[in-house]
Amino acid sequence: GPKTISIKSMADLAGKTVAATRGALEDQELTKVAPAGTEIKRFEDNNATVSAFVAGQTQLLATGVSVAGVMMQKNPQLNTEYKLLLKDSPNFIGVAKGEDALRTKVNAIIADGKKSGDIDKMAQKWLGRPAGQLPE
């Protein structure tokens, strides 16, 4: 949401309007934790959700970090920032059973990226924030 709105905890969502994509992880998690008085406006897809927020139809936006990062890059005039983490849901890389050499190589590349700081640099560049704690 905009830097002008102070949101430090879930309780601060009371009295606010929040855009969310109907049925998405963010909608489900927000519905669980939003206090009474939070108005969740649901939209059919990410594009409609982001468009509604950008157009000022809601005060806040509940979405994944990759969607939020692109929205913030494309709309710097909104002066937005990350507010709260609804759920930490990392992405994973799937490797077919029996592909032990490939899995080992992928894990080594990820470990090297974590150690060198390259993963955090890429996350900062593309998502506007560090990668955070990654699973082992």
Question: What is each PLM-predicted segment?
Answer:
Residues 1-2, 23-25, 45-46, 62-69, ...:
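Beta->alpha turn/N-cap motifs
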Residues 1-17:
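Flexible hinge/capping segments at coil-to-helix
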Residues 16, 38, 89-93:
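Small-molecule pocket liners
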Residues 29-33, 54, 59-87:
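A ligand-binding cleft/hinge motif common to bilobed small-molecule-binding domains
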Residues 69-111, 129-136:
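Periplasmic-binding protein-like
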